[in-house]
């Protein structure tokens, strides 16, 4: 993990990246938070980015949750309000992390286009085959079926990703089955967010995540303080879109009110 320190810190934000990516794709967002007075804590999830494990493969989704737990422990050492921002699969990790805590001890949570359902549907035969392969060949990798231009309209980001050797393009059968299992778990109603301020920020033209499932989850989650905002016309990676400064302002307005 890494820490980017603000000159006059008022809070700490822990950022959890999504599938296939890593911390290097968040340079703009990290600097926006840092220059706004937030220490930023972030790392690469297991099997992604600069981690030494097999890229695109995990044994269990719990590996992600355990890793993020260490990041949050680091954030707490600053004795400042701690916020959690999870994007896409990182949002799913954030949800499951909160559910596992008796007392989350975080000031607020932002979910950016959280992965609570997939737009791209795997055909039934391949899905059935993956169940068997998950037992006999869990590390077998297949093409993710995702293209970079499905995630953002930002041409600069698209060009950078096309030449990025750390961008994961193949995932294991085990990774796929663990993702589906965790999505199913996350959709079970929970009171874990009852006392945690929650902001869900969803791309209006999301080509990766099924936003109807995000709305369903949001409507079903018990919380004394929750808000949903949808960004019309924006693709999945709202913090990379041409309108990202407006998106960031909305995220910061949410966190600032709890400092």
Curated annotation (Swiss-Prot):
MF terms in GO: carboxylic ester hydrolase activity; lipase activity
Protein keywords: Antibiotic biosynthesis, Hydrolase, Serine esterase
The keyword Hydrolase belongs to this UniProt entry's keyword annotation: yes
Gene3D superfamilies: alpha/beta hydrolase
Catalytic residues identified in the record: 88, 206, 236
Known EC number: 3.1.1.-
Pfam families, per database record: Hydrolase_4
InterPro entries with a match to the protein in the record: AB_hydrolase_1 (IPR000073), AB_hydrolase_fold (IPR029058), Hydrolase_4 (IPR022742), MAG_DAG_Lipase (IPR051044)
Cellular compartments per GO CC: membrane
Catalytic class of the enzyme: hydrolase
Gene disruption phenotype: Cells lacking this gene entirely lose the ability to produce bacilysocin and display a 10-fold reduction in the ability to form spores.
Pathway: Antibiotic biosynthesis; bacilysocin biosynthesis
GO biological process per UniProt: antibiotic biosynthetic process
Family: Belongs to the AB hydrolase superfamily.
Its job: Phospholipase involved in the biosynthesis of the antibiotic bacilysocin. It probably catalyzes the hydrolysis of the 2-sn-acyl moiety of phosphatidylglycerol to produce bacilysocin (lysophosphatidylglycerol). Is also able to catalyze the hydrolysis reaction of one acyl bond in phosphatidylcholine in vitro (actual cleavage point is unknown), resulting in lysophosphatidylcholine.
Protein name, per record: Phospholipase YtpA
Species per Swiss-Prot/TrEMBL record: Bacillus subtilis (strain 168)
């Amino acid at each position: 993990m890494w820490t980017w320190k603000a000159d006059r810190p008022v809070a700490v934000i822990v950022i959890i990246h999504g599938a296939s990516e890593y911390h290097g794709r968040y340079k703009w967002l990290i600097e926006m938070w840092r220059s706004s007075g937030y220490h930023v804590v972030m790392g690469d999830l297991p099997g992604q980015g600069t981690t030494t494990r097999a890229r695109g493969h995990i044994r269990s989704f719990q590996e992600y949750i355990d890793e993020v737990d260490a990041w949050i422990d680091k954030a707490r050492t600053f004795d400042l309000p701690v916020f959690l921002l999870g994007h896409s699969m990182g949002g799913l990790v954030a949800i499951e992390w909160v559910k596992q805590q008796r007392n989350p001890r975080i000031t607020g949570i932002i979910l950016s286009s959280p992965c609570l359902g997939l737009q791209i549907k795997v055909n039934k035969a391949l899905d059935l085959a993956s169940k068997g392969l998950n037992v006999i060949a869990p590390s077998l990798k297949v093409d993710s079926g995702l293209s970079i231009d499905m995630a953002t309209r930002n041409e600069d980001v698209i060009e950078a990703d096309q030449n990025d050797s750390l961008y994961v393009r193949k995932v294991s059968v085990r990774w796929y089955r663990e993702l589906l299992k965790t999505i199913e778990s996350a959709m079970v109603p929970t009171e874990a967010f009852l006392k945690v301020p929650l902001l869900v920020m969803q791309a209006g033209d999301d080509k990766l995540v099924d936003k109807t499932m995000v709305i369903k989850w949001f409507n079903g989650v018990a919380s004394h303080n929750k808000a949903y905002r949808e960004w019309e016309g924006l693709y999945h990676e709202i913090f990379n879109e041409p309108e990202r400064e407006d998106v960031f302002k909305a995220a910061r307005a949410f966190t600032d009110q709890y400092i």
